Structure formats: structure tokens, C-alpha cells
């Protein structure tokens, strides 16, 4: 009886051509690691109802998690949504070599250039991409709206696609998938340092143009690998048609059900919106600094439309958990409390204790030993904690209560601006953008490494003559 029923199912599918099994795709992704190759040793989480200090992420832990998820999903895509470089001494000293070496352990299926990839001009980006191309991965580098001048820019000595291409097409489970890359345009031109003749086109119209081009080639499963920011991605999705998934970066947005950990997510993982034609679009991004690996599972119908999206932002933790004792010192928690923390981690799908990949860790050690020697020199002392806030009272400082910055803004940013003014004998004022200073500064000895972590970008101080009316 049963064998005839099962024999009849393929025959039934032939009679009903529109009855097609859902196609599944898994995407693993990171973004904005900004040369943060080591673990964050100051991650604060609420675990079992108490504030707990742990270590999170680091690129060797990213490698471990991606290997684990790939073994569970053999046909997955692995994507990087930009700003791989700039932000720590790993870039300052090695100009992208260390980042490229660790990225080539993963072998990403595509990488979109971010705005900070242009901080050292087109030639600086070429240097990084040459390192990236030294390995066996040959990761496609995307940027559909990046227009280097052919014959002038080192990015385009012979053609516009010498280093950066608008999209790549991959195949998974017998289906072609187009991956388009875009980078935030105005911000890159205004706050980074691309060559003067390198242009950046409108993000929305560029994304639509290449989606249409892929569709005309019969590719109707389209991923936008976007370094445009979470809110911008949501808006872009609603203004365009034909994009199925947006894997984003730039805004350092944390997504997922993580508020119980004391974190402040910007939205759900994934976030679902409708495009201009009413079709579903999945939007994801994976926070910052090698601390989260996103795992997105999408399903398509026979026409290439999204029917389902679900996933998990994975935060990788070290097996180290500290809390303040009666003297205010952070110490490793005792066994009974540790078991309670383990129980919290076990039931939270976003948390896992991850051992760094040994090969990646050994590779990183070759660079970190040189950094340790350079950065350990003490150059001063700090008498009190100095808060970092881009917006007064925003509450993103990892060290200070928002009330401390609500009136006068970021302590350390103001001090940096004052230092710039004092360096110039002629200046009446100095302006420092809030995003140019990157970390809180703790009281105590201050090292050369601390200074580079605070001000990691190769910016140039310039003097301008302006009227008071011109300054806004």
C-alpha cells in the first residue's frame, strides 16, 4: 500500500507544475571588523541577573564559528559587508596585511568595500586588496557605485573592474545567485580620502540598475551586500524591486533579541520589509569588531521570491566571567555562579563559548607580538575616566553614565579638539568630529597603543580661515 503512495508523489508533481519545493539558502556574514582582530576583553553583559565582564569575539573566534556553521550548512554563502580595515594598530602598522591574512583563512564569497577602506586614498585600498589577493581565496571585491577614473586611479589602471566589480554571480543548489555591492556615497567622499577623480554614484538607483541587469540574465535571486547603514538599507529596500536579501554594514547596528543581556539592539534579526512591488526583503547586519557572526536562513519559491527568513546573530564568548568583589575588583566568578552563567548561555541561541581557531590564532600572534612591543611604551597618565559619546547623553559609552555627558558631550572628544587647537598657534577654535575619536579612556597610565586606539585614522589637521557666520 505505502510503496504505491510514495511512487505516486513524483507523478503528482508532474501534473502540478507550480508545486515546487522551497529552495533554501544559508548566509553567514560579518561587517565592520575595523582591524579588531583580537577579542574584546571589556565586554559587559547581564548574565543571570548580574553585570558580568567577559571577552567577546576576535577574528580567530570568528573563524571557529564560521567553520562550525559551514559544517552544518555545507552550501552556505559567507559574506563581508565592508570596513574590514582601519581602527586599531593592526592596520596602522601593517596597512591591511594582517586583516587580509585573517580574511583569507575564512575565504569570503564576496566582500564589499566600505567607506573606511578609502581612508588612505585609492592607493591605500590597492595595497590592502593586493594583500587580499595573495591568498588562494581570490574573494570578489564589490562596489557597484564606485567609479574610479580609468587610467588615472590605481584601482583602474586598465579598466573600471581591475580591482572592484559591480556584482558577482555564484551558484548554490543548482540556482544562480547575484550579489551586488554598494558603499555609502556621500559619507565616503566627505569623511574618507578617496582620490579626487573617484566618483560614488547614488546607492538606490545603482542597486536597482544592477538588479535589473541580473534579472535580464535570468538571475532572479539577488543579494545586496551593502555598506550603507541599517536604516538606509530599510529605506532602499522599500524604494527598489527585485532585491531579496540585504546583508549590511556601516552603521554598526546590533540586531536580535539581546536586550536581556543589557545590550541595545536596533531591530530584529532578520528585519523584514516589503519592496516597491510588495515582495518580502530580509535585512540583516552583524554589529561590529569581530564580535558577531550572522547566520541567516532564507527560503525562495519557484519564482525566486522570498517566502521565509529566520536566523541567529552569534556572539562568541571566551570562558572567562568576572564580577566585582566587595573591594570593587573584578575577579573570576566561583563555580556555583559559573554554572548559573553556563545555564544562561546554554538556553540563549545567540551565545556560545568559542575556542579560537588554532591556526588563525597562530597567524595573528605573528602580528600581535610586534604590536605589543610598539604599543607598550607609556607616554602619559590620565587622572580620571574620560567618556566617549558621539551625541551628548546618548548612552553608548562603555564607561560612563549618560547623565555625565548630557550637558557637555564627550569628555575625550573635547580634549582631543582642545589638543588640536593648542598645536596650532594661529587657531581660535578646533573642530573634531565625534566619530573620529573611538574609545573611552580609563584613568591610569596612557600608552602609545592607547593613543592609536583612540585616534586610529590617518587624518590630516588643516587650518582654514572662516568667519563666525560660516561656522555652524
Regions found by a protein language model. Give the residues of each.
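N-terminal signal peptide c-region/cleavage motif recognized by signal peptidases
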Residues: 16-17
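Acidic, metal/ion-coordinating pockets
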Residues: 22-320, 411-419, 430, 465
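Non-catalytic terminal accessory segments
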Residues: 25-28, 53-57, 70-73, 215-217, ...
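Bacterial N-terminal signal peptides that target proteins for export
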Residues: 1-9
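Generic anion/oxyanion-binding catalytic loop in active/binding sites
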Residues: 11, 196, 460
